[in-house]
Design a protein with these regions (language model features):
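Domain-level signal for Mg2+-assisted phosphodiester chemistry and nucleotide/NA-binding surfaces
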Residues: 1-90, 94, 119, 134, ...
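VWA/integrin I-like adhesion module and closely mimicked acidic/polar interface patches used
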Residues: 122-152
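C-terminal helix of von Willebrand factor
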Residues: 149-177
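Structural detector for short beta-strands of small beta-barrel domains
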Residues: 174-190
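Short aromatic-glycine-enriched beta-strand elements
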Residues: 190-198
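A short macromolecule-binding patch
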Residues: 202-213, 242-243
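Short nucleic-acid-contacting surface segments enriched for D/E, G, S/T with interspersed K/R
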Residues: 213-230
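OB-fold/S1-family single-stranded nucleic acid-binding modules
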Residues: 233-263
Length: 266
């Protein structure tokens, strides 16, 4: 199986994926086949680089790290404009470059992992599928519904172990007892529910029980909600586990304040 990865880095950064680990992403897709193309499309402020040497060194250092993991980095210079109010606005849209290269390089690929939530890629996904390419979307928050519906499969980036590191936790502690992991809700009952989360090996899914008392305040749980939680031994089921200290990461709706309308997150 020949695999390609195409990352809309700016979209991912602005949509909950700031700080993703490129080495983890490479290792994740490698279990399904050979990663032939690994492309990341990033924006850089070339004007700032000419005067801010700390920013320049930091940017070059980051790009070098990403390249060391086997990724080709395609940079797009930020162009600055003034809006009608005189405010300075920067734009660096790499969507066209990314779309063209996906179409050109797809003839050598079987599956493409597309990291973006941008609905502008809907037609590109359709074109790739018409060429016999499987397209899987990985994103965090603010995913276009149209893009979601076109994908052959969607996986929240939060669910890939350590793709986005858990705060103040070693990578090897993901899913260990009394440590944190992330999972999605697949069953809601009267006062309790169940989630699935990927084990540290990134291959096997595990089930975990949760009680509504562990939900964030004022959150009404929905199917497919994504949570970060602590894994603890169940006091009732021998060998069982339960989720505590649950934190919502991605949800369809939050319970509104009085007088507010429900606010969709996706």
């Amino acid at each position: 199986m020949k695999i390609g990865v195409f990352i809309d880095a700016e979209n991912i950064r602005r949509s909950g994926g700031y700080g993703i680990r490129y080495d983890v992403l490479r290792d994740y897709v490698s279990q399904f086949g050979d990663p032939i193309r690994l492309n990341s499309y990033m924006s850089v402020d070339e004007a700032r680089m000419r005067t801010d040497y700390e920013y320049k060194d930091r940017t070059h250092g980051f790009l070098s790290i990403v390249r060391s993991y086997g990724f080709k980095v395609i940079t797009k210079a930020i162009r600055w404009f003034e809006d009608e109010d005189g405010q300075r606005i920067g734009k660096a849209n790499a969507d066209l470059d990314m779309a063209v290269e996906m179409l050109l390089q797809s003839q050598h690929l079987d599956t493409i992992y597309l990291l973006t939530g941008d609905g502008d890629f809907k037609r590109v996904v359709q074109a790739l599928q018409n060429m016999g390419i499987r397209v899987e979307i990985v994103a965090f928050r603010y995913i276009s519904r149209e893009l979601l519906h076109e994908a052959d499969q969607f996986l929240s980036g939060y669910l890939i172990p350590n793709l986005l590191p858990v705060l103040d936790q070693r990578a090897e502690d993901w899913g260990a007892m009394s440590c944190r992991a992330r999972g999605y809700c697949y069953s809601v009952q009267d006062g309790y529910g169940f989630m699935k989360y990927l084990d540290i090996d990134m291959r096997s899914w595990r089930d975990i029980f949760f009680h509504f008392s562990q939900l964030p305040e004022r959150h009404y749980v929905n199917l497919d909600d994504v949570f970060e939680f602590t894994i603890e031994p169940s006091p009732r089921a021998e060998g069982g586990i339960l989720a505590t200290h649950m934190q919502i990461l991605h949800s369809r709706h939050f319970i509104p304040d009085k007088g507010e309308k429900p606010t969709p997150v996706v």
